[in-house]
């Protein structure tokens, strides 16, 4: 295969995956956050994940996660997940929902790999490698960060409940 053909294929596939990512991302931005509350079981953190610690132990996520670009840099409508707006319960909950959205976007953007099943093996191999290397680190980062934030959120909720009960009982 000529260099020209390889470059042309690379350009076409880059455009394809960029279009897929942007389309899925924009489609999911239109999805109300209430969906991520209603279907929270789809985003359940399993006990064997040990609140995300498993992913950090296996892949040392805390060493490289800061290299992942924040999507909000490219699309102003995307919530910036680098920092919490504040430590208010509503902001923490909103961040958790946006992390669920980010995870789902990356899972959904992997689905089009099926298009390449009938393609020559080297094309399929290259695209599978791309999907795994581009999407899986982000999914794993969400699976590492979100359980920790959810745990913090639950602790804050319990603490706030106790504080409210103490205030009511002292009245």
Curated annotation (Swiss-Prot):
List, alphabetically, the GO terms of the cellular component aspect: plasma membrane
Q: How does it sit in the membrane?
A: Single-pass membrane protein
Q: Mainly localized where? A: membrane
Class in the EC hierarchy, top level = transferase
Instruction: List the transmembrane segments.
Output: 125-144
A single MF term (Gene Ontology): acyltransferase activity
Listed A to Z, the keywords are: Acyltransferase, Carotenoid biosynthesis, Cell membrane, Membrane, Signal, Transferase, Transmembrane, Transmembrane helix
Q: Where is the signal peptide?
A: 1-25
Which InterPro entries does UniProt cross-reference here? CrtO
In which pathway does this enzyme or protein participate?
Carotenoid biosynthesis; staphyloxanthin biosynthesis; staphyloxanthin from farnesyl diphosphate: step 5/5
Assigned EC number: 2.3.1.-
Q: What compartments host this protein?
A: Cell membrane
- What does the UniProt record say this protein does? Catalyzes the acylation of glycosyl-4,4'-diaponeurosporenoate, i.e. the esterification of glucose at the C6'' position with the carboxyl group of the C(15) fatty acid 12-methyltetradecanoic acid, to yield staphyloxanthin. This is the last step in the biosynthesis of this orange pigment, present in most staphylococci strains.
Q: Which family does it belong to?
A: Belongs to the acyltransferase CrtO family.
This chain's protein is named Glycosyl-4,4'-diaponeurosporenoate acyltransferase
């Amino acid at each position: 295969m000529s260099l020209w053909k390889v470059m042309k294929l690379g350009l076409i596939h880059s455009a394809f995956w960029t279009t897929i990512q942007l389309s899925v991302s924009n489609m999911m931005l239109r999805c109300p956050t209430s969906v991520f509350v209603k279907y929270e079981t789809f985003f359940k953190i399993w006990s064997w994940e040990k609140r995300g610690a498993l992913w950090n132990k296996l892949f040392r996520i805390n060493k490289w996660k800061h290299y992942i670009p924040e999507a909000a840099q490219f699309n102003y409508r995307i919530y910036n997940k680098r920092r919490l707006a504040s430590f208010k319960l509503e902001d923490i909950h909103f961040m958790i929902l946006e992390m669920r959205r980010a995870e789902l976007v990356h899972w959904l953007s992997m689905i089009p790999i099926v298009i390449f099943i009938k393609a020559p093996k080297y094309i399929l191999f290259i695209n599978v490698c791309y999907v795994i290397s581009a999407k899986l680190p982000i999914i794993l980062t969400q699976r590492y960060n979100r359980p920790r934030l959810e745990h913090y959120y639950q602790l804050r909720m319990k603490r706030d409940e106790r504080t409210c009960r103490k205030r009511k009982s002292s009245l």
